[in-house]
A protein has these predicted regions:
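Ligand-binding loop in jelly-roll beta-barrel domains
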Residues: 65, 121-147
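Glycine- and acidic-residue-biased ligand/ion/polar-headgroup-sensing regions
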Residues: 88-91, 95-100, 105
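Conserved short histidine dyad/triad with adjacent acidic residue
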Residues: 70-87
Length: 150
């Protein structure tokens, strides 16, 4: 049986186990709750991490118990930046729209829609919005030490 509940703008979908005909075992076994979230429900205005300017952060699944993956969308508004910083875990940026200036280990390059960037532990990087449109990116990394920043 599928049960759907809406809490605080978040749709919680839970697949409940069914009893077998004999009533002695669960088929299928109980699984962790799955979530569906819309960006309008999780959007927050924030300064650019490690940098400055205005951004909108969309922290998807931040309240999901035991999720070790961070999946976020961030819109860097005019002149905003994710400041240059040293990376402590693998992190992926994917440029959805807009234009940015990426600094990766001291080298600068212009990035735009369709660009994927992998930063590895020990490397340093920063990203700044340039051009007329917001720079919209997807950020994915494995959560460490219970911190869900960026």
């Amino acid at each position: 049986m599928l049960r759907i509940a809406v809490a605080g703008g978040v749709c919680l979908c839970l697949l409940l186990p069914r009893l077998s005909r004999g009533g002695s075992s669960l088929v299928p076994p109980l699984q962790a709750s799955s979530l569906i979230e819309h960006d309008t429900a999780v959007a927050t205005q924030q300064p650019g991490p490690h940098g400055g300017g205005k951004t909108t952060a969309y922290s998807f699944f931040a309240r999901a118990p035991d999720l070790q993956l961070v999946f976020r969308k961030r819109a860097l508004h005019h002149g905003a930046a994710i400041g240059y910083h040293r990376q402590e875990e693998d992190e992926i940026y994917y440029i959805v729209s807009g234009t940015g200036e990426l600094t990766l280990n001291g080298a600068r390059s212009v990035v735009g829609p369709g660009t994927a960037i992998l930063t590895r532990p020990g490397s340093s990087h920063g990203l700044r919005q340039v051009g007329p449109d917001d720079l919209v990116i997807i950020i994915v990394y494995q959560q460490s030490s219970g911190v869900r920043g960026r």
